[in-house]
């Protein structure tokens, strides 16, 4: 669930918004016509906040936090990755230091279902450690990461929450 009125997890991110005359800009206007509460800037605030909650909950293996934020299909993928990490005796540490840039890359309205894809450039520490504490992957250093996440919402629903339906690292 992403409250589009939420404040950004980290202030000061550079915003990249589509030209209103572009296909993405036109799709955002179609979403706004069907969902009067939709505002692209507030949506990005919520997406940034959700990103922080989701990556940190994933690192902790906090399934209870993840479940309401993700579609069933996305949750199944995250759950499988957490289970594999647990089975291997590994732990993940993720510290989101800042959101440097966020932008809307794609938008679509299919029937009552709105989908908005965002690109997030963040600075984070991300590492996986074995039982003995040795680093399996990642590093203690702050690394710039780029992620592309797609959120979805039924615009006829009284629930203003958006769910993560897809994620990739760019």
Predicted regions and their residues:
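Long amphipathic alpha-helical segments used for membrane anchoring, targeting, substrate engagement
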Residues: 1-6
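Structured, amphipathic secondary-structure segments that form assembly/contact surfaces
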Residues: 56, 63-170
């Amino acid at each position: 669930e992403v409250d589009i009125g939420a404040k950004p997890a980290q202030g000061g991110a550079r915003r990249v918004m589509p030209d209103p005359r572009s296909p993405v800009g036109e799709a955002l206007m179609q979403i706004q016509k069907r969902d009067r509460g939709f505002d692209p800037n507030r949506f990005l605030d919520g997406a940034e906040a959700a990103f922080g909650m989701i990556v940190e909950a994933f690192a902790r293996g906090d399934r209870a936090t993840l479940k309401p934020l993700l579609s069933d299909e996305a949750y199944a993928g995250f759950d499988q990755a957490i289970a594999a990490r647990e089975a291997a005796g590994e732990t993940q540490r993720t510290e989101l230091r800042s959101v440097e840039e966020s932008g809307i890359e794609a938008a679509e309205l299919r029937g009552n279902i709105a989908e908005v894809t965002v690109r997030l450039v963040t600075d984070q520490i991300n590492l996986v450690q074995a039982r003995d504490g040795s680093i399996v992957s990642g590093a203690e250093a702050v690394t710039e990461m780029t992620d592309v996440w797609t959120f979805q919402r039924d615009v006829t629903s009284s629930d203003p929450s958006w769910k993560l339906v897809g994620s990739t690292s760019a």
